Amino acid sequence: MPMKKHLNDQKMSLFLFIYIWIMYAIVYWTKNCFSGAMASIVAEGIMTKSQTGLITAVFYLVYAPLQVVGGKLADRWRPDLLILIGLIGSGIANFIIYLNQNYYLMLIVWTLNSVVQSALWPSIFKIISSELAHEHRIRGVYYITFASTFGLCFAFISAALMSKWQNNFLLSSILLFIMAIIMAIVYPIAARRMVPDETGPAKALHEDFEHPEDLDTRSFTMFKKCGLFILLPVVIARGLLGLGIKNMAPTLLMESYASVSPVVGNFLNIFIILSGIVGMYFVKRIYPKRINDEVKGLGLIFTILIPVVALTLLVGKLPLSPMVIILCLIIALTEGSGLFTQYYTVKFAKYGKNGEVAGYINMAAAFGIVIQSYGVAKIADMWGWIAALAVFLALVIISVVLIIIVIPKWKKFTREYHM
């Protein structure tokens, strides 16, 4: 296990974060190339919604369990090497799909892409929450959430602007290789300027550090006590709902409103995705000043989601504009809840568990995407959009119940472990 180090040089820390932000936005864009192109692929008759969804579903089905392994690796190995593996491997996968659009080959290549990317996010989160200058860590956790929002937007913008949807994969491949080259240059420079952490587990966001010797800091014990395993289904629901709306909104609107073409659907979806910024800003304003409990904040957002998601059952009956606003509200709330889970994860950096927790959280979110990509798409194919949206509503209600169970566990845990 490498010695824990961090940057004191604030300029270098800021420069490293800016690179990581751009790199992660591009990675998130490339992970969603199929989602961005779904409306065009379906409209051209190349694949059905469920076939396109299956490619994304298999990606996340393999990606999800490997997130736990990736989280453990991020806590033990050099994060830059794990990131390089992800960037280069993903660049190769995107280029192969640009060259050959055989359905089964795409399915295999995209599955291998999920393997090489498995440690990428935990490694990114490890750098932000443990290796940046102390002053940049909490802000870094906040601003990195915008990278995924803009990355997904770029996926739909490029899909709408490209003359052929295959070109999206070519551009993705080129950018991933460029990011890999920059990573190989920038991180070693930053690493040479890092200083060793103080004795004991790495400090996360604060200068003070308490680590009573009688506490059981084994991962499984800590995660069981804090209610992490009960919270994972909530993260699954968030991933399913949030990315489900983002990925399926163009097709949903296209099939529910005659005035919406694939191109119009993609452009409308850009506004829906960008609304997530409002939700993240809202959470930043209330945390930690008004709500300093991450799980309670999560509960508040999911409670608000219940009536908002219920309104989606009126799709096709309500005019287009109100429905787009409703979808925007859902994305704002799900992105806000995602920021609460990021703050929740950072708490564990105090005990050197932040990479592992990030892996579990990302694993759960990935399972949600699996269910959305194939399961919900299949429900929409067989029984229509109302049935698929009813599934979203049921999951939100179940999530509220689970959060209520976790709240007292988390409160007790944070007191016991001085978080």
Task: Give the positions of each predicted feature.
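Juxtamembrane intracellular "pre-TM" segments in multi-pass secondary transporters
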Residues: 2-10, 194-231
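Extracytoplasmic gate region of multi-pass secondary transporters
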Residues: 34-38, 226-281
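Conserved MFS/SLC helix-loop-helix module at the cytosolic interface between two early adjacent transmembrane helices
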Residues: 65-101
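Helix-to-loop junctions at the C-terminal end of transmembrane segments
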Residues: 66-78, 279-293, 380
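Cytoplasmic helix-loop-helix junction between adjacent transmembrane helices
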Residues: 109-147
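Helix-loop-helix hairpin linking two adjacent transmembrane segments in secondary transporters
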Residues: 143-192
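C-terminal transmembrane helical hairpin of 12-TM major facilitator-type secondary transporters
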Residues: 293-340
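A late C-terminal transmembrane helix in Major Facilitator Superfamily
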Residues: 348-383
